[in-house]
Amino acid sequence: MNQDTLHRYLFDNADVRGELVQLQDSYQQVISAQEYPAVLQVLLGELMAATSLLTATLKFSGDISVQLQGNGPVSLAVINGNNLQELRGVARWNAELADDASLTDLFGQGYMVITLTPDEGERYQGVVALDKPTLAACVEEYFNQSEQLPTGIWLFADGKQAAGMFLQILPSKEDHNPDFEHLSQLTSTIKAEELFTLDAESVLHRLYHQEEVRLFDPIDVSFKCTCSHERSAGAIKTLDQAEIEAILAEDGKIEMGCEYCHAKYIFDAIDVAALFANGQTSTTQQ
């Protein structure tokens, strides 16, 4: 089965909607960019699944960023995506991390910033504290604050695969919904192994075999980096001229690296001169 897909589903006999995402190749591309400690591999997987689930709730074309920051040994973990389910991500850390480190161990006094940037319209940003025991609970708190709709989030990752599930009461329905509470209890019985080995239809049947579930066509999820020659050239043009000359004098080139995919863009003295002369340059990617 394709292990990089998101499925939406509805319950015909309940005012509740759901999503299920399963990631493998895209997840591997994110965590293979650096030698991440095991705990960060898991965190990035959960963050990817959460971002995919969040993206599927958007009703516009545009971008989303889910960013974790704090004053702990991990200063940043972020997944960027868009309405096409194209994701990329990175984390930064400065100390050895235990495999069983908690969110507080990783980020100290941390917070999650979710930024929605529509192609048309105003940007929206929501901030919640990383003061819950799990990332899933923090994402649930975001929904409680932003949409004020009862929402359940389940996230899993093991360094090889990542997955997540989402349940939410349909808008305009009563906040107290016994169907939602019942379905949340059923969903809470899901095991990571089931999400990693079964297709979506089998997972939903195993969880909700007594419910009437309508499963929609899958949506592909992929890794896509937005780095380019042009962006790297633009970054060089923001540097001070003296700094550029010093780098060229010492190294003979300026090397721009992408921390998301580790692509390298190399500009020699001729490239840089052409860049400032007419805004164009020939560059080499390695």
Curated annotation (Swiss-Prot):
UniProt PTM comment: Under oxidizing conditions two disulfide bonds are formed involving the reactive cysteines. Under reducing conditions zinc is bound to the reactive cysteines and the protein is inactive.
Subcellular compartments: Cytoplasm
BP terms from Gene Ontology: protein refolding
Chief site of localization: cytoplasm
Alphabetic keyword roster: Chaperone, Cytoplasm, Disulfide bond, Redox-active center, Zinc
A GO MF term: protein folding chaperone
Signal peptide positions on this chain: none
Disulphides: 225-227, 258-261
Domain of life of the native organism: Bacteria
SUPFAM superfamilies: Hsp33 domain, HSP33 redox switch-like
GO cellular component: a single term: cytoplasm
InterPro entries, sorted: Heat_shock_Hsp33, Heat_shock_Hsp33_C, Heat_shock_Hsp33_N, Hsp33_helix_hairpin_bin_dom_sf
Cross-referenced NCBIfam families: PRK00114.1
Family, per entry: Belongs to the HSP33 family.
Function: Redox regulated molecular chaperone. Protects both thermally unfolding and oxidatively damaged proteins from irreversible aggregation. Plays an important role in the bacterial defense system toward oxidative stress.
Protein name: 33 kDa chaperonin
Organism (species): Shewanella baltica (strain OS155 / ATCC BAA-1091)
